[in-house]
Regions:
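Acidic-enriched and Gly/Ser
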Residues: 1-123, 137, 145, 149-183
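Short, conserved beta-turn/loop elements at beta-strand boundaries and strand-helix junctions
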Residues: 129-131, 141-146
Length: 183
């Protein structure tokens, strides 16, 4: 049975390290190695541009049944990379954590799509995307950066992470959809 384990790497080098680890570790030792990302929008020169950012900066997720072998290959690398462990034992992601990440993404495309929400007075109501039905995970929202901050458990630790959330008034939503239809 394959299980997801977390590999800690240097923050900002997730993609480079994923490629190096995939070259270093034999294909039979890992089913999949990825770093989950989220889709969001940033404003560049007055225009909204789609971009992706790491969901858990500094962490990769490895689908393996043999974390010890993966760790042995990581120790041979010049760069910092290690399978997370506690008291000398490798700690897999809990079933709930795997279901949450697996529910937001799918194999081959580990990017959490952007959610949409409507601002109704002081309330923000998620109307579309992976956050629909998971509103309880949202701790804060930064409308200017089109992100929602979620608090969840990862390997027994409370972690705050970001996902894309476009919060629009009803009028802005109509205008944005119209612009996308024209483009």
């Amino acid at each position: 049975m394959l299980v997801w384990y977390v590999i800690q790497v240097i923050n900002g080098r997730e993609d480079v390290m994923r490629e190096r680890i995939e070259r270093m570790v034999p294909a039979g030792a890992m089913q999949e190695l990825f770093y989950p990302q989220f889709q969001t929008e940033i404003k560049v020169h007055g225009e909204w541009v789609d971009t992706t950012k790491p969901l858990f900066p500094g962490y990769l997720i490895c689908d393996t049944s043999d974390p010890r072998t993966v760790q042995q290959y990581l120790l041979r690398m010049d760069d910092f990379a290690r399978v997370l462990s506690q008291d000398g034992r490798f700690v897999p992601l809990a079933k709930e954590e795997v279901q949450l990440i697996g529910g937001f993404t799918h194999r081959g495309d580990r990017v959490v799509p952007m959610s949409e929400a409507l601002k109704d007075g002081d309330q923000v109501v998620v109307t579309a995307g992976p956050l629909l039905g998971h509103e309880g995970l949202i701790k804060t929202i930064n409308r200017r950066k089109s992100t929602a901050y979620l608090e969840l458990d990862l390997c027994g630790r409370r972690v705050t992470t970001r996902v894309g959330l476009a919060v629009l008034s009803a009028e802005h939503r109509v205008m944005r959809n119209l612009k996308r239809a024209i483009a």
